[in-house]
Amino acid sequence: MLQLLVRVSSCNKLVTLSSSKQLRKDQFERHLFMTAQQSIPSISVTYAHNASASKSNELGMRVMQERAYQKRGEQYLLIKSPPASGKSRALMFIALDKLRNQGMKQAIICVPEKSIGSSFHDEPLSKHGFSEDWIVKPQWNLCNAPGTDGGKVDAIKKFLDGGDEILICTHASFRFAVDKFGVDAFDGRMIAIDEFHHVSANPDNKLGAHLAEFITRDKCHVVAMTGSYFRGDAEAVLHPEDEAKFDKVVYTYYEQLSGYEYLKQLDMGYYFYTDSYTDKVLKVLDANEKTIIHIPNVNARESTKDKIKEVEHIIDALGSWNDTDEETGFLLVTGPDGKILRIADLVDDDPTKRERVSRALKDASQKFNRDHVDIIIALGMAKEGFDWIWCEHALTIGYRSSLTEIVQIIGRATRDAPGKTKTRFTNLIAEPDASEEKVTHAVNDTLKAIAASLLMEQVLAPRFDFRPKNSGAMVDYDYGDGGYDPNKCNVGVNRDTGSIQMEIKGLAMPQSDAAKRICKEDLNELLTTFVQDKQTMERGMFDSETVPEELTQVRMGKIVQERFPNLNGEDQEAVRQHAIAALNIIQQAKKKATGGDSGEPTLNLSLIEGVRKFAMDVQELDIDLIDRINPFEEAYSILAKSMSEERLKQVAEVIAARKVSLSLEDARALVKRAIEFQAQKGRAPSLSSADPWEKRMAEGVVYLQRMVREGKNV
């Protein structure tokens, strides 16, 4: 169940969100504006709670691991699965099969940092039904070895020349080894890349360049794993032609969290504040919740530039320091209620103290001890690969440029643990201030935080299966009261998988296998590029003259063409329609689930019911209607209700100052749509049309005609 809740703490009244068009009529009036002193909008997702994720088959494999193992014979395999879903163990099963049954000489596991190497320690797999155990000889887990990454290159060469089978090293050590010995030295080996989002198709990304060489040589097997197939810089992870060679195993957040035994609710909130964050932390922090606090990087806007004092302020706000635990290094702080809080400080500049605390947090004997630690304060640590199952709140201070980093931080809080039914992620962000020299950067940070929120909604939602109207009922799908009706656009739900089948009139369907795979597996990557495009979001949220189709058809169409140039025009259009449908239907379902149209909160509605209500409330759900929805209208509503009126005006002014006129590229795209319009309607788009989209297409035609008259190369 996906719900957007807005509360006013002073009267605890629920407030609904109106559409952006209503907001723009009277741009900054008639709204409730909230600051960090009040509760703010949050995404609240409730899951099925069926414990399937913790159940194992006869080989000791959980659902995701079994799914991955079924594709163990693929030469190139990409596993996309959330944090804590068991990717490391899935790789163990696959690697052992490649060594025993697929002719691979050795398995090399590459992780981004040394601490993650512990995920691949020895595992007694045979104890749970598998044919053998996972055993790594100590000298070949280079993550445990002293020295620099570059200094471990000779050890990798010794491993390659020897007879042992499994090696663990960092991405950096692996890069240095490939630089020195060449890709041919790794022929006949399985290379596994954990946290694959560190790779990029950019030529400057060494790991990405090496991977492309391995694929070109085609003499090794590659298994890539990631909890978030996103990059904060919006770079492509792989070139399309290389990506097409990978078979994918996709296990969604929805499947993961629905399958938990205990945890059933995840809340996400974005809080804006003024002045210093250290004065606002307790507004969003509950000392009774097991919490990881990530303070801002010293170069971030939110930083006071003194990380040590920031930690001291947080500790002072929590209570009074009593002592330091000699064994663990945890700070013992007495809260206002007399409770002793055990606080782990991973920010301390003293490496001896920090290492003692870090070692205590990794103590395997304390993994299931809920009382071992209460609050962890970190800066760059406690993210990727950090395992603390009891974490109930991930509090991140400052904007994070990478969606991947946000997913990784959220993953720290989404472990299943006895008695843990709810968890939350909070991002505390400084409001843009016009007095700042870098106000433009501050505005960009704010918009990117909202983009991350939109993307996380997509990540957390169930999977959609879009089909044209009258496609027929599917087995195991519930179509609501009365069942499947061939006279309408139906919405069916598979309660076991959480998949939603939705019929849309006029929907173009992918024809090639590549396009079908993209529509099934890769829509979130397209949406990432779309919502992280600064100009697209600015126009969608703040330019009242922007017609939704300029975003949904022109901008998304361009992204699809750039991302998948090898698809034909029909398949590109099908992919575009599926991507926009996924984004807009989630936004509209969220609005329906919270009573956003009627003004009456209906918080008992789940996302699924919101989807059904949206489909029922329109006379007929067709792709043209979906294209006419501004994908950012709900995002604007969130911003208008969570930021002060003065700050919101400043944001609008900054964005208005950099508004750009129609580009030649956009004009070409509009002319293409105008040709389609003329084929359908039997006439050209008119400049005097009351339909803003028709008028915009006509403007594109006029612009291009003018360029031709002026002798420009169009």
Give names to the regions the model predicted.
Residues E74-I94:
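Walker A/P-loop
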Residues P351-L454:
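Conserved RecA-like P-loop NTPase helicase motor core
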Residues L238-D279:
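Interdomain hinge/linker at the junction between the two RecA-like core domains of SF2 helicases
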Residues V183-R217:
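SF2 helicase catalytic motif II
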Residues P82-P83, V111-P112, G117-A155, I166, ...:
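Conserved C-terminal RecA-like helicase domain
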Residues R415-T546:
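Long, hydrophobic alpha-helical segments
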Residues I94-S119:
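Conserved SF1/SF2 helicase motif Ia
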Residues P82-A84, H197-V199, F214-V237:
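Conserved helicase ATPase motor motifs in RecA-like P-loop NTPase domains
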